[in-house]
Amino acid sequence: MEKFGMNFGGGPSKKDLLETIETQKKQLLQYQARLKDVVRAYKSLLKEKEALEASIKVLSVSHEADVGLAGVQLPGLTFPDSVDDRCSTHSEDSTGTATSLDTAASLTSTKGEFGVEDDRPARGPPPPKSEEASWSESGVSSSSGDGPFAGGEVDKRLHQLKTQLATLTSSLATVTQEKSRMEASYLADKKKMKQDLEDASNKAEEERARLEGELKGLQEQIAETKARLITQQHDRAQEQSDHALMLRELQKLLQEERTQRQDLELRLEETREALAGRAYAAEQMEGFELQTKQLTREVEELKSELQAIRDEKNQPDPRLQELQEEAARLKSHFQAQLQQEMRKTALAEDQLRQQSQVEEQRVAALENQISEVSELLGTYEKAKQKDQLAIQKLKERILQLDLENKTLALAASSRSPLDSHGEESSLDVNVLKDKMEKLKRLLQVAARKSQVTLDVEKLCDLEIMPSSEAADGEKATALYYQQELKQLKEEFERYKMRAQVVLKSKNTKDGNLGKELEAAQEQLAELKEKYISLRLSCEELEHQHQQEADDWKQELARLQQLHRQELERCQLDFRDRTLKLEEELHKQRDRALAVLTEKDLELEQLRSVALASGLPGRRSPVGGGGPGDPADTSSSDSLTQALQLAAANEPTFFLYAEQLARKEVEITSLRKQKHRLEVEVHQLQDRLLEEGERHREEVAALQSHIEKNIRDQSREGANLEYLKNIIYRFLTLPDSLGRQQTLTAILTILHFSPEEKQVIMRLPTSASWWPSGKR
């Protein structure tokens, strides 16, 4: 219940109860100690009071005795000397008592000042000895002055004074003893408090020293950790700088190795070319004929190879097709994944929409239940008000009937049968008429209150009777009064029965109202339980939706990570393939260039041979040889063969140039295709980034929607917010009739802010119906 911000029980928790029990135990112990101190002080004060009362009693008795003794001795004395002696004796007694009191006060003061140095309680009695001596001296002087006539009285007086002195000394001793005991207890408490203060100060000093030591240790540890962190930071910085230097050196070494490798490759190519030239020059003259035949065969083979190369070049490259297929497959894969993600987001949106609809339906159901509860409470309040009005009317009716019963009882008691006989014998007609007038007025008042028509006009007829028929009138009035008394008794019985019926109906109505109130309370408790169960189910659904949203977030992050990894892998594959294709193109170019250089050299050699063989053929016609000469035929055959070779080898340059141009075109097309693929990869990356951004926006929108649902569930939706505003306007109205039950029912669901409560509490009519427990 505490999780929902509600406490239907209204009681504190177990921890608070235990804390209150502990504090009350401590307070009880303190109160017990204080009570013991108070009892001890009260006992000492009682002892002092008893001692002081005894001393006061003794002093008062001594004074009365002195006065009585003086009154007894004055008639029997004839000499003024004896009067003077007695006066001196009395003055000596009074001075003795005064000195004794002064000595007692001085003793108490000295005891209060030096109670620690002198604790003996028996130090007070010495002053009474001197006083007793003075009393004895005064007694001797009085006895010597008075003679045997006052000897017995003086002895009695001396004995009485001694007893008074003993009581005074004992009371003084008790007072001084109590004072000394109080002083000793005070000093002991003071010493104990000083000792406690010293112990507390020592403990505080020890605790302060310990805390200072711990603080110093912690400061040293902090300094050590700071120094260690600084050294570690310096070490890390040094390691980073060393690693950077090592990387630079390794990069330099790698660059040097690359340059050396390139130089070695160039040298190797040069040496190869030199060796090929030397071997070709050495073997040129030896295998000319064999080379011509081989060259012809090689030319044919080269023609066939060139034709095959042309056919292959005309056909599309399978690697390029594989790359295009791979790119298309990746595109389709990414599009399928994007569509799948879009479907998932659409499903999530549908689920959230359905959930929001379900929540709205629940909120509407809760609003309907709240409206039903408010209507039910309104009907109960109206019925209660009607019942209260009926009860008030019945109470007024009962009070009216009580008043009527009282008046009738007074009237009946005023007319008893014994009194009627006495009045008939003692009263006359005028007195009876006056009483009849009074009874008539009482009957009229009772008739007006009870709404019962009584025949009061007969009394008026009695007044108009003649004086000659007075006796008959008196008899008629007596009979009429008896009948009226019977009617009044019957009316009183009817009123009593009616009052009993009214009380029974009131009790039954109160019972029915109590049952209806209990039923309403049970229904309210059931509604509270339903509200709590609905709140719990809403929280469970909220937790489930939050968990589903977290799962969707994790799935989205995982898919994004997979897409990034797959994109990086595809980029690496494309780079590797492009590098391999470039290497193969370079190798093929090198091979084609080497073959073309060899063929150029062979063609140059053939041309030189053809030119050398063509010179003697031109000279033979000058020598007069016929056409049938075999030398001429051989030379012409060789020339035609050379020309045929030259004619056959001349298109190779054009083929080479065409092949180079075709290769350049293919290279440019491959570069364009590579550039296009890179552009497509960049577009895919941009699209993935856009999709990721869109997914993030959708996730943010879904999160905001979930938070909105959570806020709506926490306040039971915007409709309940609207309901709260309406109730707030209703509460600010000046009319306060029937708001208590509705407010207690709604405050279990809605929570007002402190500002709203202050605004409501500022109103003058809100203090009567605002509940004290909800302020």
Curated annotation (Swiss-Prot):
Write one Gene Ontology MF term: small GTPase binding
Coiled-coil residues: 13-61, 153-763
Q: Which residues form the GRIP domain?
A: 713-763
Q: Which Gene3D superfamilies match?
A: GRIP domain
Enumerate the residue ranges of region (Disordered): 84-153, 614-639
The residues forming the signal peptide are none
Which cellular compartments is it found in? Cytoplasm; Golgi apparatus membrane
**Which domain of life does the protein's organism represent?**
Eukaryota
| Compositional bias segments (type: Basic and acidic residues) | 84-93
A single Pfam family it belongs to is GRIP
Q: How does it sit in the membrane?
A: Peripheral membrane protein
GO annotations of cellular component type: cytosol; Golgi apparatus; Golgi membrane; Golgi trans cisterna
List UniProt keywords, sorted A-Z: Coiled coil, Cytoplasm, Golgi apparatus, Membrane
Q: Does the keyword Membrane apply?
A: yes
State whether keyword Cytoplasm applies: yes
Q: Name the InterPro entries for this protein.
A: Golgi-autophagy_related (IPR051952), GRIP_dom (IPR000237)
Q: Where is the composition biased (Low complexity)?
A: 94-110, 133-147, 629-638
What domain comment accompanies this record? Answer: Extended rod-like protein with coiled-coil domains.
Main role? Answer: Probably involved in maintaining Golgi structure.
* Protein name per the record: GRIP and coiled-coil domain-containing protein 1
Q: Where does this protein come from, organism-wise?
A: Homo sapiens (Human)
Q: What is the lineage of its organism?
A: Eukaryota, Metazoa, Chordata, Craniata, Vertebrata
